[in-house]
Structure formats: C-alpha cells, structure tokens
Amino acid sequence: EILTNSGHEVEEIFDPFKRLGEIITVKILKVHKPEDLKEVVVCEVTDGKDFFTVLTTAKDQVKPNLIVALAKPGSFTFTHQKVETKEIRKYVSQGMFLSPFEAGISEEKNKLLTFEEGTPLGKSIYEVLNLSEPVLEVAITPNRGDLLSIYGIARELNLICNWELKPLEFGDDLKGGKVFP
C-alpha cells in the first residue's frame, strides 16, 4: 500500500510456498519391504487424522515414528514436479516424501526432510518451520531503474517512511575486486 500510494504499481503479492499445494508433516507408522519390489519400500503414514501409503526409494532413511514432509497428490515440489498418485504393481503411492531441496528450504538433495519428535502432524511444513516469504511483484517504469533490486525498493521505503536502512555488506570474497571463477 505504501508503494502504491507513492506512485509505484504493486502488481501482485504472493507466497511461493503456498502455491505449492498441500505439503504436510506425517509420521511413518510402518515400513514394509515387499519381495516383488527391488529398490522401493512401502510406508504407512498418518497425518493424525487420515492414513496414507507412500512408496519411496529412500529405504535406508525411513523408519517407524519418523516425522517427514509429505507432498500430497495435486501439489508441486519446489522444482515444479507435480505430485500424483502412482501405482507400481499392486502398490499405490498417495504422495511423495520430500528432501529439503524439493521442499525449497535448502540445497540438501540426498536426504529426507525430517522433523523432531512432537512436531504437530498434518500441518503445512512451512507453517511448522515458520517460513513465509511474501514476494512483491512491482511494475517498474523506465525512469526508475533504481527500483530493480530489493535494495532499491528498501531505499525507496526508507525515503518515504523514514525507516532505518541498513547498508549493504558483502563477504570478504566479494571485496577488493576479485573476479569469480
């Protein structure tokens, strides 16, 4: 509203995590290794109300009582992969366990996103992690190229509202004119 009232058009405000769909915390109840599936285990999980079956190749990481992130059918991973109900032989997977990378919260790709014992079940993982990253989409006019960065928007808000503006700080690897490899 402040930017709009000062003549800058805010086209949209959105939370990219909410666009992903239903990604919730679930507890693994049972892990079963069927003889007719080589690299996959069948996990029975609950969100505290309902029960789901999930097939996963992370067989060395899953165990009973572990709380993990489940992307339900119809949701998307942070890498834009749509999660669907899948059937392998006679087994049906009702979602997908996510790594921190697939959930969009870190670069770790080779492990499941797990939570501490006692974490509420059936809640959005982003709510549990207290993550909310609203994104402003601002229409920039040709004469206001200084607003093309987050720092430029912060400087503008500093001028309009007299809010404190912290100076930009760079790590030692960016000081002194070093060139990136």
Q: Language-model features: where?
A:
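Phosphate-backbone binding interfaces of nucleic-acid-interacting proteins
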Residues: 1-174
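Short, intrinsically disordered, charge-balanced linker/junction segments flanking boundaries
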Residues: 177-181
